[in-house]
Swiss-Prot record:
UniProt keywords, alphabetically: Chaperone, Disulfide bond, Membrane, Metal-binding, Mitochondrion, Mitochondrion inner membrane, Protein transport, Translocation, Transport, Zinc
Subunit note: Heterohexamer; composed of 3 copies of ddp-1/tim-8 and 3 copies of tin-13/tim-13, named soluble 70 kDa complex. Associates with the TIM22 complex, whose core is composed of tim-22.
Subcellular compartments: Mitochondrion inner membrane
Disulfide links within the chain: 35-60, 39-56
Protein name: Mitochondrial import inner membrane translocase subunit Tim8
Alphabetized Gene3D superfamilies for the sequence: Mitochondrial import inner membrane translocase subunit tim13 like domains (1.10.287.810)
Amino acid sequence: MDSADPQLARFLHQLQAETQRQKFTEQVHTLTGRCWDVCFSDYRPPSKMDGKTQTCIQNCVNRMIDASNFMVEHLSKMNGGSA
């Protein structure tokens, strides 16, 4: 196949985008697992959440959002888009 083939180029672009999405999803799962381990030391949520646990979860979620925004901006720049 010719490398200038537009269908091939489109396919390769879609493949790259899907690979990036998969890596992002794996990252989210990893971070979620880490936050769970940090915030719930006994691996199960308590019947009533105390202030310390609530703060831990809030901070963790905020860091995940920050990481997500960073990754979206980075992927957008890689694809030639604007953030």
